[in-house]
Structure formats: C-alpha cells, structure tokens
Amino acid sequence: MRDIKTYLSVAPVISTLWFGSLAGLLIEINRLFPDALVFPFFSF
C-alpha cells in the first residue's frame, strides 16, 4: 500500500494536474483574447 501511495504522489499525478491546468489556462486565454489570425474572419 505504501508503494501505491508513493507512485501516486510522484510524477504521473503531478504532471497530469500541471498539463491539465496549463491546457485549461491556455484555452481560456485564447477564448478571452483570440490571436490576430481570427480577427479578419469575425470583423465583417
């Protein structure tokens, strides 16, 4: 049981949480402030 707790507390869980939060942050930034490539398509 201690080995399972050690495994779950190291790299897989930490990297999953980090990349998940980073992806969510990038999605929200691109939703609120879209980059310049999409401006000509929405400025009719």
From Swiss-Prot:
| Membrane topology, record value | Single-pass membrane protein
Question: Which key words are in the record?
Answer: Chloroplast, Membrane, Photosynthesis, Photosystem I, Plastid, Thylakoid, Transmembrane, Transmembrane helix
Q: Name one GO cellular component term.
A: chloroplast thylakoid membrane
Q: Where are the transmembrane segments?
A: 7-27
| One BP annotation, GO | photosynthesis
Top-level taxon in the UniProt lineage: Eukaryota
| The keyword rRNA-binding is annotated on this UniProt entry | no
The UniProt entry, under HAMAP family, shows: PSI_PsaJ (MF_00522)
Q: Which family does it belong to?
A: Belongs to the PsaJ family.
Know the name of this protein? Photosystem I reaction center subunit IX
